[in-house]
Amino acid sequence: MTEINEKSLLKQALAEIKKKFGNESIMVLGEKPPIDTEVFSSGSMAIDMALGIGGFPKGRIVEIYGPESSGKTTISLHAIAEVQKQGGIAAFIDAEHSIDPQYAKNLGIDIDNLILSQPDSGEQALDIVDTLTKTKAIDLIVVDSVAALVPMAELQGEMKDQVIGAQARLMSKALRKITASLNKNGTTVIFINQIREKVGVIFGNPETTPGGRGLKFYASIRLDVRKIQQITSGNDITGHSVKIKVVKNKLAIPFKTALVEIVFAKGISKSAEIAQLGEELGILVRKGSWFAYKGENIAQGKVNLKLLLENNTKLFNEIKDQIIEKLKENQQQSQTL
């Protein structure tokens, strides 16, 4: 067979595939310029920076895991608020039956337009996710949490029964189905997960996450969320500082970290982020115990700086705009190197 005939047959085969499954089903990569990944903000500038692409990617699976009360749900709720701000539709699959509508409202979520499901089993939860992703109308689905996705076999069995690997099989099967429609329809699914300890592990990390290996494989991004210290006001504990590590990233450089402050009943502190990033980028200059902006001392100590930024919207937005400009400059410089 000549080279011309081979090329002709290949061309015919490609045309047939496109006719059957659509123009986007197959292509020669060099014919089409690379498409930038569409993203939406996480609601935190620090997390957006750590992700390397400016936010969570559309049409992908994201896993957020960590110990209890570390801020996983808060991060996910902030993402929902951002999607709604852009006019998108979000769904919250509350397998733990623990969502606090008032807290969600405090974080900026329009609860009147949030789709909520409290499923009775793991199969029901994942079937709902699969159905929603196929509608093309949902931008973000949050599943809270993988550990609470209990298979029917376990729910219907007796306490003494051991259903080994049932949840892992359920997750693996569901993820195969869900992934196929996610990218096509531009829906992002965030799975919140907990941490378990393997029994009998002496060497290495004993920590693992429920749901088997399927989620680790299918997730484009995995975030490890940990509390590092408490935030206090006098004798009262008002929140905690959280370290978020990007342990897997298929779209940018992994292993970057973000530090955020989560304040009880308020969520991620935007003023703390602006104070931190402003100092890191040289927009705010520390002079002893004072912080200076444009050569003028504006606040003594970090606490007073955060309070000033909270109460002075004009200053907050001015510094925020400069941070965004500085980050764009840094990104352009890194691309030219």
UniProtKB/Swiss-Prot annotation:
InterPro entries, per the entry: AAA+_ATPase, DNA_recomb/repair_RecA, P-loop_NTPase, RecA-like_C, RecA-like_N, RecA_ATP-bd, RecA_C_sf, RecA_monomer-monomer_interface
This protein's UniProt keywords: ATP-binding, Cytoplasm, DNA damage, DNA recombination, DNA repair, DNA-binding, Nucleotide-binding, SOS response
Pfam family, one: RecA_C
GO biological process: DNA recombination; DNA repair; SOS response
Subcellular location(s) of the protein: Cytoplasm
One term of GO molecular function: damaged DNA binding
UniProt main location, coarse: cytoplasm
Purpose of the protein: Can catalyze the hydrolysis of ATP in the presence of single-stranded DNA, the ATP-dependent uptake of single-stranded DNA by duplex DNA, and the ATP-dependent hybridization of homologous single-stranded DNAs. It interacts with LexA causing its activation and leading to its autocatalytic cleavage.
Any one cellular-component term (Gene Ontology): cytosol
Domain of life per record: Bacteria
HAMAP family noted in UniProt: RecA
Binding-site residues for ATP, renumbered to this chain: G66, P67, E68, S69, S70, G71, K72, T73
Name of the protein described by the UniProt record: Protein RecA
Family: Belongs to the RecA family.
